[in-house]
Amino acid sequence: AEVERQKVKRLAIDTLSSPEGKEALDYLKLKRGFSVNVIDNFGLGYVPSHVNNLYGDPHEFAGRIVLPIHDPYGELVALSSRDWRKNAYSKFFHEQYIKSNYLYALDIAKDHIIKSNQAIIVEGEFDVMKMHSIGIRRAVGMLGSSLSIKQISLLSRYCQEIFLVFDGDEAGRTSMERAMKLNVKYGLKQYYDILIIPVAMPNNLDPDDF
């Protein structure tokens, strides 16, 4: 599975910069506003729509933008994907892995987190990239709908302050409430030496809107 995952990642990266990946690349650059540098740093790619899996069926990532998920040391854990087209049947799809054990882009942000002694957690992968693209490189993503104590414990190795910048919609507010309950339940300041700081976003906006 690991070899296959690496092959798909390599194919996706190579295809994104080819004529076949132009539509996906245009979306990332023009619609999302990401520079080539950000796209390269995060290892984004595109799997051609005609690619099949080992059984001859259409590959699960075919025709999708691929985002690699790494552990804090840069080891590839899983592949996530997004179909950016308006009428997409399934907007997001990812391999099975324990999302609550990882933080998106921690491998990229780790040194900046250590240097500043603080981290910023946002909800979506593209939110993380937007933060990094405007120079806020201590941002990571929570890879799911709720923050876990495992993720906080992971960050406590590198910093003492965590800012939560979640979406301004109802789901984002619910995620914020859950995260703050962890603060009380586990006594994060006392036992993890971590200060959790919530940051309110304007209604129905997320960090990627700025």
Located regions from the model:
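Non-catalytic accessory segments of DNA primases and related replication-initiation nucleases
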Residues: A1-N53, R64, L76, K91-F92
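Conserved phosphate-handling catalytic cores of large alpha/beta enzymes
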Residues: S156, I162-F210
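Short phosphate-binding/catalytic loops that engage adenosine nucleotides
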Residues: G33-F34, I136, I194
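Conserved beta-strand edge residues that scaffold enzyme active sites
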Residues: V8, G43, S145-S146, D169
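Short, small-residue-rich loop/turn micro-motifs
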Residues: R32, S80-D83, N204
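Phosphate-handling DNA/RNA-contact segment within nucleic-acid enzymes
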Residues: A1, R5, V47-C159, T174-M176
